[in-house]
Design a protein with these regions (language model features):
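Single conserved hydrophobic/aromatic residue that forms the stacking wall/gate
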Residues: 1-10
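Extended, non-catalytic structural segments that build the interaction scaffolds
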Residues: 23, 107-113, 162-183, 226, ...
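Metal-dependent nuclease catalytic cores in nucleic-acid-processing enzymes
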Residues: 28-45, 285-291
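Catalytic adenosine-cofactor/nucleotide-binding cores of aminoacyl-tRNA synthetases and other
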Residues: 58-62, 66, 70-147, 247-253, ...
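Acidic, turn-prone loop/beta-hairpin segments
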Residues: 60, 137-168, 196-286, 306-311
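Core structural elements
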Residues: 93, 118-131, 151-163, 181-202, ...
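Short amphipathic alpha-helical coiled-coil/interface segments
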Residues: 120, 160, 164, 183-188, ...
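C-terminal low-complexity, glycine/proline- and small-hydrophobic-enriched intrinsically disordered tails
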Residues: 244-429
Length: 429
């Protein structure tokens, strides 16, 4: 009746018509979508929808459309059973760039959905840890605690405001894969990798009460916003965790996450100064970790640190964060200046120069020998590639892509050797 009678009460009401967005595949654009629009104008005098979103086609790694006849299909129910609906949804959404198809390996389903599975697990584990840390007691309203917020609190609130704005803009433009990527980076790369690590000590029951309450309220506020942003993509794990978040006394809480209002970017939380300071701090910790790994410094080994240059007040800001630097970078002292002796150097994103003394930390002579052997090996491989490129017959007769690959290989080998020579010079050679 509804299909054949456009004058029925249901069809003539404004409840279902017109819609907003039609989601469909491109192959039926002319045969179905265009005809729906024509019939809408014919019988209702207006189009049935205002926007059409054409999604890609799921294909195997050979680019073939999945079908029963080819036997290359993936049963979504089996994926849900094995990894969960959230993992499947995030994997697909993160690949659905506009104008492209989605490629999944039907012969290795675990690898195909590993990214979504790992992210869903990360959300769950981080959410559980946060819930245990903040407890069940009601939190205080954020506006009442702004004077007690630490720098990391102001930073993550500012990052939440940016993430909210970018996710909203991405959804409005149907850039779903960009939304998934941005929220992945925000939750995993900013909340988990940095903020949770920085506030762990403040969430302990022994911590100063004002600092602890500020950390609790900030963490819950950020998770509330993050779960609302992530909910359209990973609905189940976010709804479960969101329902357990503590709430301020007397605040009206939505019945469920699915009906909670979409968050709006809070201009009051934007703090470009604290974001710039935090970026320098993150760059320092990241570079120290990289140097520790490159030179084989053990996890439990504490090292010193010298910093010079960078923006005005950068070293003072590091001094304020000394405990955090020591905790995250395994550093036992931070000094101002160029540093001297045998060690490793790095330049931070803000232009500051970093020096890590290595005398007595590693076996310097052994590290010198290792680097020299690697340089000799790289020089030998490079000589072979350059000899090949010096052969006019090879350059003239070989396919262009083969010659270009050889040239790129030579440039990479030269770059690797030059970097090792710089490191070797830092060790006194």
């Amino acid at each position: 009746r509804l299909q054949g009678d456009w004058s029925s009460d249901v069809c003539s009401s404004d409840l279902f018509y017109p819609g907003h967005t039609m989601v469909t595949a491109p192959e039926i654009l002319f045969f179905w979508v265009a005809r729906m629009i024509m019939m809408g104008y014919e019988f209702r005098g207006e189009a049935p929808f205002t926007q059409v979103y054409l999604h890609g086609t799921v294909r195997d790694i050979k680019g073939r459309k999945m079908s029963k006849s080819l036997g290359n299909g993936i049963d979504p129910l089996e994926v849900v059973e094995a990894f969960g609906a959230d993992a499947m949804r995030f994997t697909i959404v993160s690949q659905c760039a506009v104008g492209t198809d989605i490629s999944l390996d039907h012969e290795n389903v675990e690898a195909a959905f590993a990214n979504g599975r790992n992210f869903a697990n990360k959300i769950w584990n981080a959410g559980r840890f946060a819930l245990m840390s903040v407890g069940d007691a009601p939190i205080q309203p954020l506006d009442q605690l702004r004077g007690d917020l630490a720098e990391e609190d102001r930073w993550i609130l500012s990052r939440l405001s940016h993430a909210t704005e970018e996710a909203t803009r991405g959804l409005e433009r149907f850039r779903l894969h960009e939304v998934a990527e941005r929220l992945y980076h925000f939750f995993w790369g900013e909340i988990c990798d940095w903020y949770l690590e920085l506030v762990k000590s403040r969430l302990n029951v022994e911590a100063d009460e004002a600092s602890r309450e500020a950390a609790r309220t900030t963490l819950v506020t950020v998770l509330d916003g993050a779960f609302r942003l992530l909910h359209p993509i990973v609905p189940f794990v976010t709804a479960e965790l969101w329902a357990r978040l503590p709430w301020p006394d007397g605040a009206q809480r939505p019945e469920d996450l699915i009906v909670a209002p979409w968050p709006m970017p809070a201009d009051v939380d934007r703090d470009e100064t604290v974001e710039a300071d935090m970026a320098g701090f993150q760059s320092l910790v990241t570079e120290v970790r990289r140097l520790r790994k490159e030179y084989g410094v053990g996890e439990g080994q504490r090292i010193g640190l010298s910093v010079q240059g960078g923006p005005e007040g950068f070293f003072d800001s590091l001094s304020v964060r000394a405990a955090a630097v020591e905790q995250l970078a395994r550093v036992d002292r931070i000094e101002s200046g160029a540093g001297a002796g045998v060690g490793a150097n790095a330049v931070l994103s803000n232009g500051a120069e970093l020096f890590v003394p290595l005398e007595g930390v590693i076996d310097v002579e052994r590290e010198r020998e290792r680097m020299q052997k690697e340089i000799t090996r790289l020089e030998g491989v490079l000589a072979g590639v350059e000899k090949r490129l010096a052969n006019e017959q090879f350059v003239s007769n070989a396919p262009e892509e083969v010659v270009n690959t050889a040239r790129e290989n030579a440039a990479q080998l030269q770059d690797q050797a030059d970097k090792l020579r710089e490191k070797l010079a830092g060790l006194g050679v």
